[in-house]
């Protein structure tokens, strides 16, 4: 019973994280004056920090749901990439080239999040995720 609930929490959180990354891209676009944005990046920054809870729930759901080790590992990788993502802008003053990796890391984060979400959905449907 707990494992089934954990797997459902895992899949829902994974898809919410995918949606959150897409919302983040939109909020970043709203902050760019070149695209007509006037609000700055405050919403992008605040929302970016708030989704840490979702990425942590992905891992918790995988653990409670007794997901395969590979799925747990991918969930940990999401957390690592998330913390890299939130750290990259702080390199702006000392290393702008490193800070410029922020959008590229966001793409990696989105790809991995989709992969984790698809595999999570297969877990709840009873189909073994591909290795």
Residue ranges with predicted function:
Residues 1-131:
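Polytopic transmembrane helical bundles with strong interfacial aromatic enrichment
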């Amino acid at each position: 019973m707990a494992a089934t609930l954990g797997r459902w929490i895992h899949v829902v959180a994974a898809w919410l994280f995918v949606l959150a990354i897409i919302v983040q891209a939109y909020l970043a676009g709203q902050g760019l004056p070149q695209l007509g944005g006037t609000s700055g990046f405050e919403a992008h920054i605040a929302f970016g920090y708030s989704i840490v809870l979702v990425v942590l729930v992905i891992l918790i759901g995988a653990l409670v749901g007794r997901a395969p080790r590979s799925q747990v590992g991918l969930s940990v990788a999401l957390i690592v990439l998330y913390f890299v993502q939130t750290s990259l802008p702080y390199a702006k003053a000392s290393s702008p080239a490193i800070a410029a990796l922020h959008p590229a890391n966001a793409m990696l984060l989105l790809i991995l999040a989709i992969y984790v979400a698809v595999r999570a959905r297969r877990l709840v449907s009873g189909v073994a995720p591909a290795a």
